């Protein structure tokens, strides 16, 4: 048994001790606000056949923790004792057992030892939510994903293109990939020493080392690792002393065949106020661009998150989110979480109308208003039919199908009700609109060409 493992020879105090460590790790990792919201009222109940049973105060908190944090909690328990195979979260006390509430300090812990989130060979905290398994791959990020995976799977060797330089806008997945590399190495090659750190934190630690006359220790720390990952390297632009130290750290690691992974919001050639010699070295290896998300990728990300969270979301809501929240993945996931949380707290069903109301401020700030008239004009032009055909009752396929598509897009891209949309299409009733939307949704299941056509129309309308 590892020296970090806590022997669980009975089902009493030792299990309670493990829960206290896990609770502290959760507090330290997620912070006071999130801890108090979700974990502070969770109690240890008992253990049974290598299963730890915890009690949440409400069904909502139980379900939320199960969907978002269950794997994190299990991994933390297993760090302290790998005999624990599963956790169960209930909302009732088990008769004859004693609840154990872990009281935590109001300040963040500064020194928690033996944490699964901060092991001796992984410096700086890795976010357990970000793994390769839950990274959704699409055309905009497939090169970056493949390269990150190759780095992680190199098993002690150095990826042939060193450093790996990932760049792209905010919230597109660069940080996710860096955490995924760290977690993969930690799980499969635990003897390898990995540092993941933001460039800002790198600078602050360097300044602190200068102030405390501990520069030698700083150099030893960063130049003795197997993998160094620095996030948001653009932060050191214009900071000459930090650039000098980074330059020498970079050279030492590359010369010793150690892996480097760097992320940035722009390509190396576009960095300003940074030394040319650093700019040149950042481009030595593989430079992978993480592009803005496509509609298909956003759809995949939403479906993956919904599956992880084990919730049911109507198709029209998913399509609406994928078409409307286009800036970045972080905002997309935030919008989904907001919709789900609103439903859980208010006990209102998740519908397209409710979603549009919940996100109206976000949508207003994101893009211009699209009207039903805009959609009718663009679709008519795209399919080379008369605008008047949108209001007619003609059933010829070459007219009826574009009209159905326009109704579908009106439901997805505008806040109008079915009845209001029907009025815009020659005073048709809401059942006609509903039938059109359902027909298009059924076709989208298998018709790739139609899916691409609708994606193109969305881009035309949104731009």
Swiss-Prot record:
Q: Does the keyword Glycoprotein apply?
A: no
- The source's superkingdom equals Bacteria
Record-linked Pfam families = Bac_DnaA (PF00308), Bac_DnaA_C (PF08299), DnaA_N (PF11638)
Alphabetic keyword roster: ATP-binding, Cytoplasm, DNA replication, DNA-binding, Lipid-binding, Nucleotide-binding
Q: Mind listing the GO biological process terms from this record? A: DNA replication initiation; regulation of DNA replication
| Compartment(s) where it occurs, according to its Swiss-Prot or TrEMBL record | Cytoplasm
Task: Show the segment(s) annotated as Domain IV, binds dsDNA.
Answer: 344-463
Disulfide bonds, paired cysteine numbers: none
Q: Provide the binding site for ATP.
A: 171, 173-175
Instruction: Name a GO molecular-function annotation.
Output: ATP hydrolysis activity
Q: Where is this region: Domain III, AAA+ region?
A: 125-343
Q: Name one GO cellular component term.
A: plasma membrane
Instruction: Give the chief site where it resides.
Output: cytoplasm
Which residue intervals make up region (Domain I, interacts with DnaA modulators)?
A: 1-84
Ranges for the region named Domain II are: 84-124
Q: What is known of its domains?
A: Domain I is involved in oligomerization and binding regulators, domain II is flexibile and of varying length in different bacteria, domain III forms the AAA+ region, while domain IV binds dsDNA.
Record function comment: Plays an essential role in the initiation and regulation of chromosomal replication. ATP-DnaA binds to the origin of replication (oriC) to initiate formation of the DNA replication initiation complex once per cell cycle. Binds the DnaA box (a 9 base pair repeat at the origin) and separates the double-stranded (ds)DNA. Forms a right-handed helical filament on oriC DNA; dsDNA binds to the exterior of the filament while single-stranded (ss)DNA is stabiized in the filament's interior.
Describe, as the record does, how this protein assembles with itself and its partners: Oligomerizes as a right-handed, spiral filament on DNA at oriC.
Protein name (database record): Chromosomal replication initiator protein DnaA
- Which organism's genome codes for this protein? Rickettsia typhi (strain ATCC VR-144 / Wilmington)
What gene name does this entry carry? Answer: dnaA
